[in-house]
Amino acid sequence: ERALITECWAETGKAPIGSKWVDVNKGDAKKPEIRSRFVVKEIATYKSDDFFAATPPLEALRLLLSMAASSGHHIKVEVLDARKAHLHAFAKRTVFVQLPPELSEPGYCARLVRCLYGTRDAPKRWEAFLAEQLVAMGFARGRASPCCYFHAALGVRCIVHGDDFVLTGRAAALDEVKAGMHERFLLKELGRLGGGQGELKELRVLNRVIR
């Protein structure tokens, strides 16, 4: 929300944090998918374990895919991408940032209502929001790896890497989970691996091709 720069100095004792537009390739060299993000330049100025967000080890993905492969053809692999992931989480700190150039106005800045890419706690806030939503859907969170989830009633397993989801389960169960996730997140469906009609023969997961 728009705020006066004088408010920023009064509440934080500092000038608004810098910001910029960044083009990010969410695809690869063969199939580029360029997205423009408005980011805050705060991460490089502060480091703390308090703002660390977990990522799953590669072994977790290998185990998930191995379990799916050994369970038979009825188990599918689904890949989803959360769009504008960090914007789903509300800001918990008072953060003032510079307005983007096209909206700049002398004497004004912006106070964050939701997290933005580049704020130091955005990954942690997204992780907490995501965990809350998945648990509300019936998933149990892993103890050894907080990025791993299991829905016992539906038999669906899920690994989260940042804003990417890899799920395994029966087709009907995956459809039910996806319906619940679409109600909570902006999602892009990247495909389902399997032998059925409309299913893919290969998928790219974390820059690795699986078949």
PLM segments and residue spans:
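Long, low-complexity, charge-biased intrinsically disordered regions
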Residues: 1-211
